[in-house]
Amino acid sequence: GLLEDIDFSAWKQVVDTNLNGVFLCTQHAFRVMKAQNPRGGRIINNGSISAHAPRPNSSAYTATKHAVTGLTKSASLDGRKYDIAVGQIDIGNAATDMTTAFTQGVAQADGSVKVEPVMDVSHVAQAVVYMANLPLSANVLNMTVMATHMPFVGRG
């Protein structure tokens, strides 16, 4: 919704889910990965294309996804000395319950409503598997996976 209309409790719920959840999982994974033998591991955070180009009326969601990007970069830096690789996958328009409405049309930055293509969610899973299978000497800090015809470049 519009920024001025967002109820603070709704804002906090989005922050708790999208940011605090990622923080708590990353924090716990760091503790486990530092203590295990051999030390290290890989963390892949769930970002969003909205961290790069927001949709209209998505302040809470967009803000949390920007924050996840910052957390991912910071954790990647902090994890280096412990052989912890931290990366993020930014997903655009994967076919899920959340994107069903995209086939009827989605609000655009210019005020229009346009149908947007979606991709099979299995492509996201394949990208995550690729990231996860890299040796710890290599890290994909950020990967964007989206439908080929998704209006991302030039969206905002």
Which ranges hold each PLM region?
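A short helix-coil junction within the Rossmann-fold of NAD(P)-dependent oxidoreductases
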Residues: 1, 28-40
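Substrate-binding pocket helix/loop in short-chain dehydrogenase/reductase
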Residues: 2-3, 7-12
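Active-site loop immediately N-terminal to the catalytic Tyr-X3-Lys motif
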Residues: 4, 53-59, 116
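Active-site helix of classical SDR
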Residues: 26, 64
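Alpha-helical segment proximal to the catalytic Tyr-Lys
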Residues: 31, 77-80
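Residue(s) in the substrate-gating loop at a strand-loop-helix junction
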Residues: 48
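C-terminal helical subdomain
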Residues: 88-89, 107-154
